[in-house]
Amino acid sequence: MPPDASATREKLLDAAARAFAEEGVFNASLIEITRRAGQRNRSALNYHFGSREGVLCAVLERHVEFLARREGELLEIATRAPDDDVASVVEAIVRPAAELAQSGWRGRSCLVIIAELAGEDPATYSPELQAVMSRTGGYAVYSLLATRMADVGHDVGNERFALITTFVLRSVADRARLLDRRGRRGRPQLDHETFVRNLVAMASAAMSAPRP
Protein backbone atom coordinates (compact mmCIF):
# COMPACT_ATOMS: atom_id res chain seq x y z
CA MET A 1 0.00 0.00 0.00
CA PRO A 2 1.46 3.43 -0.95
CA PRO A 3 2.50 5.60 2.04
CA ASP A 4 -0.24 8.16 1.36
CA ALA A 5 -2.89 5.44 1.20
CA SER A 6 -1.62 3.87 4.43
CA ALA A 7 -1.73 7.23 6.21
CA THR A 8 -5.26 7.85 4.95
CA ARG A 9 -6.33 4.43 6.18
CA GLU A 10 -4.96 5.13 9.67
CA LYS A 11 -6.70 8.51 9.82
CA LEU A 12 -9.98 6.87 8.85
CA LEU A 13 -9.52 4.19 11.51
CA ASP A 14 -8.82 6.80 14.18
CA ALA A 15 -11.86 8.84 13.18
CA ALA A 16 -14.05 5.73 13.10
CA ALA A 17 -12.83 4.54 16.51
CA ARG A 18 -13.74 7.87 18.10
CA ALA A 19 -17.10 8.10 16.34
CA PHE A 20 -18.14 4.52 17.09
CA ALA A 21 -17.22 4.92 20.77
CA GLU A 22 -18.84 8.34 21.19
CA GLU A 23 -21.93 8.00 19.00
CA GLY A 24 -22.49 4.26 18.74
CA VAL A 25 -21.44 1.68 16.20
CA PHE A 26 -24.70 1.85 14.28
CA ASN A 27 -25.45 5.55 14.75
CA ALA A 28 -22.16 7.13 13.73
CA SER A 29 -22.25 8.84 10.35
CA LEU A 30 -19.81 7.38 7.83
CA ILE A 31 -19.74 10.71 6.00
CA GLU A 32 -18.84 12.48 9.26
CA ILE A 33 -16.10 9.92 9.91
CA THR A 34 -14.66 10.66 6.49
CA ARG A 35 -14.81 14.40 7.20
CA ARG A 36 -13.12 13.99 10.59
CA ALA A 37 -10.33 12.09 8.88
CA GLY A 38 -9.75 15.12 6.65
CA GLN A 39 -10.87 13.37 3.47
CA ARG A 40 -12.78 15.30 0.82
CA ASN A 41 -13.69 12.18 -1.11
CA ARG A 42 -16.85 10.83 0.52
CA SER A 43 -16.19 7.37 -0.85
CA ALA A 44 -12.77 7.11 0.85
CA LEU A 45 -14.07 4.93 3.67
CA ASN A 46 -15.85 2.55 1.32
CA TYR A 47 -12.76 2.42 -0.88
CA HIS A 48 -10.52 1.31 2.00
CA PHE A 49 -12.93 -0.85 4.01
CA GLY A 50 -15.97 -1.61 1.87
CA SER A 51 -18.67 -1.01 4.48
CA ARG A 52 -19.50 0.05 8.04
CA GLU A 53 -18.75 -3.46 9.31
CA GLY A 54 -15.54 -3.46 7.30
CA VAL A 55 -14.17 -0.42 9.11
CA LEU A 56 -15.57 -1.73 12.42
CA CYS A 57 -13.64 -4.97 11.99
CA ALA A 58 -10.49 -3.02 11.12
CA VAL A 59 -10.84 -0.87 14.25
CA LEU A 60 -11.15 -3.97 16.43
CA GLU A 61 -8.32 -5.78 14.62
CA ARG A 62 -5.88 -3.23 16.03
CA HIS A 63 -6.35 -4.75 19.50
CA VAL A 64 -7.31 -8.37 18.83
CA GLU A 65 -3.80 -9.78 19.18
CA PHE A 66 -3.23 -8.13 22.57
CA LEU A 67 -6.59 -9.20 23.98
CA ALA A 68 -6.22 -12.76 22.70
CA ARG A 69 -2.73 -13.12 24.16
CA ARG A 70 -3.57 -11.71 27.60
CA GLU A 71 -6.90 -13.49 27.91
CA GLY A 72 -5.22 -16.73 26.85
CA GLU A 73 -2.51 -16.35 29.49
CA LEU A 74 -5.02 -15.66 32.25
CA LEU A 75 -7.39 -18.37 31.05
CA GLU A 76 -4.58 -20.90 31.34
CA ILE A 77 -4.19 -19.90 34.99
CA ALA A 78 -7.96 -20.08 35.54
CA THR A 79 -8.18 -23.63 34.17
CA ARG A 80 -5.85 -24.78 36.96
CA ALA A 81 -8.05 -23.23 39.66
CA PRO A 82 -10.80 -25.20 41.49
CA ASP A 83 -13.97 -25.90 39.53
CA ASP A 84 -15.97 -23.43 41.62
CA ASP A 85 -13.48 -20.56 41.23
CA VAL A 86 -15.36 -17.85 39.34
CA ALA A 87 -13.00 -14.98 40.14
CA SER A 88 -10.02 -16.38 38.23
CA VAL A 89 -12.13 -16.62 35.07
CA VAL A 90 -13.60 -13.15 35.53
CA GLU A 91 -10.07 -11.81 35.94
CA ALA A 92 -9.35 -13.02 32.40
CA ILE A 93 -11.97 -10.50 31.26
CA VAL A 94 -11.18 -7.62 33.61
CA ARG A 95 -7.39 -7.48 33.64
CA PRO A 96 -6.76 -7.43 29.86
CA ALA A 97 -9.42 -4.73 29.51
CA ALA A 98 -7.81 -2.63 32.24
CA GLU A 99 -4.41 -3.01 30.62
CA LEU A 100 -5.78 -2.07 27.20
CA ALA A 101 -7.43 1.03 28.66
CA GLN A 102 -4.04 2.17 29.91
CA SER A 103 -2.66 2.10 26.38
CA GLY A 104 -4.50 5.28 25.37
CA TRP A 105 -7.71 6.52 23.81
CA ARG A 106 -7.67 3.95 21.00
CA GLY A 107 -7.74 1.09 23.49
CA ARG A 108 -10.50 2.75 25.51
CA SER A 109 -12.55 3.30 22.36
CA CYS A 110 -12.19 -0.38 21.50
CA LEU A 111 -13.55 -1.36 24.92
CA VAL A 112 -16.60 0.89 24.55
CA ILE A 113 -17.25 -0.55 21.09
CA ILE A 114 -17.02 -4.15 22.31
CA ALA A 115 -19.29 -3.28 25.23
CA GLU A 116 -21.93 -2.06 22.77
CA LEU A 117 -21.57 -5.15 20.60
CA ALA A 118 -22.02 -7.35 23.69
CA GLY A 119 -25.58 -6.06 23.87
CA GLU A 120 -26.33 -7.17 20.33
CA ASP A 121 -27.38 -10.63 19.14
CA PRO A 122 -24.21 -12.32 17.83
CA ALA A 123 -26.38 -14.07 15.23
CA THR A 124 -26.78 -10.69 13.52
CA TYR A 125 -23.02 -10.20 13.13
CA SER A 126 -21.54 -10.57 9.69
CA PRO A 127 -19.18 -13.56 9.26
CA GLU A 128 -16.27 -11.10 9.26
CA LEU A 129 -17.31 -9.52 12.56
CA GLN A 130 -17.95 -12.93 14.11
CA ALA A 131 -14.42 -13.95 13.14
CA VAL A 132 -12.87 -10.83 14.65
CA MET A 133 -14.82 -11.14 17.89
CA SER A 134 -13.91 -14.82 18.21
CA ARG A 135 -10.21 -14.01 17.86
CA THR A 136 -10.23 -11.79 20.96
CA GLY A 137 -10.32 -14.95 23.07
CA GLY A 138 -13.46 -13.86 24.87
CA TYR A 139 -15.56 -16.82 23.74
CA ALA A 140 -13.19 -19.29 25.40
CA VAL A 141 -13.32 -17.29 28.62
CA TYR A 142 -17.11 -17.27 28.65
CA SER A 143 -17.26 -20.99 27.88
CA LEU A 144 -15.27 -21.72 31.04
CA LEU A 145 -17.24 -19.16 33.04
CA ALA A 146 -20.49 -20.88 32.05
CA THR A 147 -19.30 -24.06 33.78
CA ARG A 148 -18.48 -22.25 37.03
CA MET A 149 -21.18 -19.62 37.47
CA ALA A 150 -24.39 -20.21 39.41
CA ASP A 151 -26.89 -22.53 37.69
CA VAL A 152 -29.42 -19.88 36.68
CA GLY A 153 -30.68 -21.27 33.38
CA HIS A 154 -29.79 -20.41 29.81
CA ASP A 155 -31.87 -17.24 29.62
CA VAL A 156 -30.61 -15.59 32.81
CA GLY A 157 -27.08 -16.80 32.13
CA ASN A 158 -26.95 -15.13 28.72
CA GLU A 159 -28.36 -11.94 30.21
CA ARG A 160 -25.68 -11.92 32.88
CA PHE A 161 -22.92 -12.45 30.35
CA ALA A 162 -24.10 -9.44 28.35
CA LEU A 163 -24.64 -7.20 31.38
CA ILE A 164 -21.36 -8.09 33.06
CA THR A 165 -19.40 -7.58 29.84
CA THR A 166 -20.91 -4.13 29.37
CA PHE A 167 -20.42 -3.27 33.05
CA VAL A 168 -16.77 -4.33 33.11
CA LEU A 169 -15.68 -2.76 29.82
CA ARG A 170 -17.46 0.54 30.38
CA SER A 171 -16.22 0.74 33.98
CA VAL A 172 -12.65 0.26 32.80
CA ALA A 173 -12.98 2.79 29.96
CA ASP A 174 -14.71 5.37 32.18
CA ARG A 175 -12.00 5.09 34.84
CA ALA A 176 -9.30 5.67 32.26
CA ARG A 177 -11.10 8.78 31.03
CA LEU A 178 -11.40 10.10 34.59
CA LEU A 179 -7.68 9.58 35.13
CA ASP A 180 -7.00 11.58 31.97
CA ARG A 181 -9.04 14.41 33.47
CA ARG A 182 -7.33 14.23 36.86
CA GLY A 183 -7.43 17.59 38.60
CA ARG A 184 -10.74 18.61 37.02
CA ARG A 185 -12.90 17.91 40.05
CA GLY A 186 -13.02 14.18 39.39
CA ARG A 187 -13.55 11.90 42.37
CA PRO A 188 -10.49 10.14 43.84
CA GLN A 189 -9.56 6.95 41.99
CA LEU A 190 -8.24 3.64 43.29
CA ASP A 191 -4.77 2.57 42.22
CA HIS A 192 -4.70 0.23 39.22
CA GLU A 193 -4.32 -3.08 41.05
CA THR A 194 -6.95 -2.29 43.69
CA PHE A 195 -9.35 -1.19 40.96
CA VAL A 196 -8.83 -4.45 39.05
CA ARG A 197 -9.29 -6.63 42.13
CA ASN A 198 -12.40 -4.72 43.21
CA LEU A 199 -13.96 -5.00 39.76
CA VAL A 200 -13.18 -8.72 39.64
CA ALA A 201 -14.84 -9.17 43.05
CA MET A 202 -17.95 -7.22 42.02
CA ALA A 203 -18.37 -9.03 38.71
CA SER A 204 -17.72 -12.43 40.31
CA ALA A 205 -20.39 -11.78 42.92
CA ALA A 206 -22.89 -10.92 40.19
CA MET A 207 -22.07 -14.07 38.22
CA SER A 208 -22.38 -16.20 41.37
CA ALA A 209 -25.75 -14.85 42.52
CA PRO A 210 -28.68 -17.31 42.56
CA ARG A 211 -31.44 -17.11 39.99
CA PRO A 212 -33.98 -14.45 41.03
Task: Please name every model-derived segment.
Residues N41, E53, W105, A118-Y125, ...:
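Short alpha-helix boundary/capping elements
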Residues R135-P212:
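C-terminal peripheral helix-coil segments that are non-catalytic and often amphipathic
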Residues M1-E23, E32, G54:
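Basic, helix-initiating cap at the start of DNA-binding domains
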Residues A19, F26-G54, A58:
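Helix-turn-helix
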Residues G72-C110, F161:
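Hydrophobic alpha-helical connector segments
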Residues I93, A97, L111-A118, I164-V168, ...:
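Short alpha-helical scaffolding segments that buttress acidic/His motifs in well-ordered protein cores
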Residues R106-V112, E120-M149:
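Amphipathic alpha-helical packing segments from all-alpha helical-bundle domains
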Residues R9-D14, F49-G72, E76:
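An amphipathic alpha-helix adjacent to DNA-recognition modules
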